[in-house]
C-alpha cells in the first residue's frame, strides 16, 4: 500500500510541476503576444502620424520590407530612402489591424505574425517576422499584400497581365 501511495504522490507532484511550467510558458507567450501586438499597433500608428523616426525605429537594423508591387523588396536603408518623401509630405499610410495571429519559435526570441488590415487599399494582409533584440521586439521582415477576393481574381489577373508579363520575362532572363 505504501508503494502505491508513494507512486501516486510522485505522479501528483510531477503533474503539478508540469502544469505550473506550462502555465508559466502560456503566461510568457501571453505577455509577449501583448507586447508584439502593441508594438505592431504603435508601428502602424507611427506611419499614420508620418513619424519617420519612430516608424523606422521599429525595424531591426538588418530588416526587409516587401511591398505590394513585385519589384518592392527593400532593406531598411533603401525603404527609408523610398519612404522619406511620403513622410516629409505627411502622405503616409494608415493601417489598422482587423485580425492578428502571432506565433512563436521555441527559443522565444523569434515570432511571426499575419494580420488583416483596414487600409486605403481596402483589406490588405500584413505578415512578418519579429525578433526580440535587447529586450524589444523589432521587425525583421514585413510583407504587405493586397488581398484579392476569389470572385474577382480573373479580372485582377487580366488587368495586371500586360504589366507583369514584361516583368516575368525580365526575371526569367536574369
Language-model segments: what does each one mean?
Residues 1-27:
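Bacterial Sec-dependent N-terminal signal peptides
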Residues 21-57, 150-153, 157-174:
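Short, low-complexity N-terminal intrinsically disordered segments enriched in polar/charged residues
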Residues 43, 55-56, 63, 79, ...:
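Hydrophobic pocket/interface hotspot
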Residues 59, 69, 99, 106, ...:
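A mature extracytoplasmic/lumenal domain signature
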Residues 64-74, 85-92:
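A short gly/proline-enriched turn/hairpin at secondary-structure junctions
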Residues 80-123:
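Surface-exposed, charged secondary-structure patches
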Residues 107-111, 122, 128, 132-133, ...:
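Extended, well-structured beta-strand/loop surface patches
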Residues 123-154:
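Short beta-strand edge/turn micro-motifs at domain boundaries
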Amino acid at each position: 500500500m505504501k508503494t502505491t501511495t508513494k507512486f501516486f504522490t510522485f505522479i501528483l507532484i510531477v503533474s503539478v510541476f508540469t502544469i505550473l511550467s506550462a502555465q508559466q510558458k502560456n503566461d510568457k507567450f501571453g505577455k509577449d503576444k501583448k507586447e508584439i501586438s502593441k508594438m505592431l499597433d504603435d508601428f502602424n500608428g507611427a506611419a499614420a502620424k508620418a513619424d519617420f523616426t519612430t516608424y523606422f525605429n521599429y525595424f531591426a537594423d538588418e530588416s526587409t520590407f516587401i511591398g505590394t508591387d513585385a519589384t518592392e523588396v527593400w532593406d531598411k536603408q533603401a525603404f527609408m530612402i523610398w519612404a522619406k518623401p511620403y513622410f516629409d509630405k505627411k502622405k503616409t499610410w494608415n493601417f489598422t489591424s482587423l485580425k492578428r495571429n502571432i506565433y512563436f519559435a521555441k527559443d522565444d526570441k523569434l515570432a511571426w505574425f499575419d494580420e488583416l488590415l483596414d487600409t486605403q487599399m481596402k483589406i490588405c494582409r500584413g505578415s512578418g517576422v519579429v525578433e526580440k533584440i535587447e529586450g524589444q521586439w523589432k521587425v525583421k521582415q514585413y510583407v504587405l499584400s493586397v488581398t484579392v477576393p476569389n470572385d474577382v481574381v480573373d479580372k485582377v489577373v487580366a488587368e495586371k497581365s500586360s504589366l507583369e508579363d514584361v516583368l516575368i520575362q525580365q526575371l526569367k532572363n536574369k
